Amino acid sequence: MDSAAGTTAAPLRIGLLGTGPWARNTQAPALAAHPGVELSGVWGRRAEAADALATAHGTRAYTGEEGIDALLEASDAVAFALPPDVQAPLAVRAARAGRHILMDKPVATTVDGARAVADAVAEAGVASIVFCTLRFAPETAAWIAEQTAVGGWFTARAQWLGSLYAEGSTSEYADSPWRREKGGLWDVGPHALSVLIPVLGDVEHLTAAPGPADTTHLILRHSSGASSTVALGLSAPRGAAGVEIEFRGEHGTASAPGWDGAETAFRGAVDALAETVRTGVPHACDARFGRHLTELLVAAETQARA
């Protein structure tokens, strides 16, 4: 799989779609600082936001429908910092234009939307990565690989509770309409599932139930025979917030380490995209995996609401 630039020696030209907090705090800094990448431009729905972010990182701003096409023309790949159901059709558009894609999780909040992305990527033969933080942060990526190799796991527990909507929270991410509508299941659920599935195997049976506020509880049966429980939410009191992932099995217990922030992890995702472009070997956390995550989350949401 060759990049649109025609050579793997040249920097990979990656354009950024989106100008919100995630783009400002994580993606744009990571792309601009990456030695193997040229940040080829920033597109935003608001011209002033696109101009500000592009100026901060020494690149060009794009806006409007024609700006999307112009950014695709100037890029080998595009990264997305947009709500999932805005991201999905634009990812299809980028793939059909022959551009590699680096998506945020979840790929979409409907199965049809996620399937359209995976199908477009397959038909175009482009590289794809879905940015699930723990799969690309160096510390947790190495830990996941180690636990997969150890095997013999009996059960697991994952708890990802944020305080985004807790009283007194001042997080700018709380202003995201899609997060408020879909809650922790959709925002942090992909992170937990992206750790459990490679270690324990695919989910063969899923049970979901609602908890307080936006919290969702899952019980999963995996193809290895192991089971896992998951608690997800964005409304925990600040003193109760935190992330814990633990496996228990034949060799004892293993708990996930901490990691050095989202920007470092995103650089790892950029590296993974570049490697897939270079080798043509799909990454395990690609558009197909993103589609499967959406299928599981839709099933869980349906059960929890019922």
Model-derived regions, located:
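Active-site loop of classical SDR/Rossmann-like NAD(P)-dependent oxidoreductases
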Residues: 22, 45, 238-241, 260-271, ...
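Short active-site oxyanion
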Residues: 38-41, 76-78, 128, 183
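A short helix->loop->beta-strand "cap" motif at the edges of active sites that frequently abuts
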Residues: 59, 97-99, 124-127, 225-226
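Contiguous beta-strand/loop segments that form the cofactor/metal-binding neighborhood of enzyme cores
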Residues: 190-257, 271-279
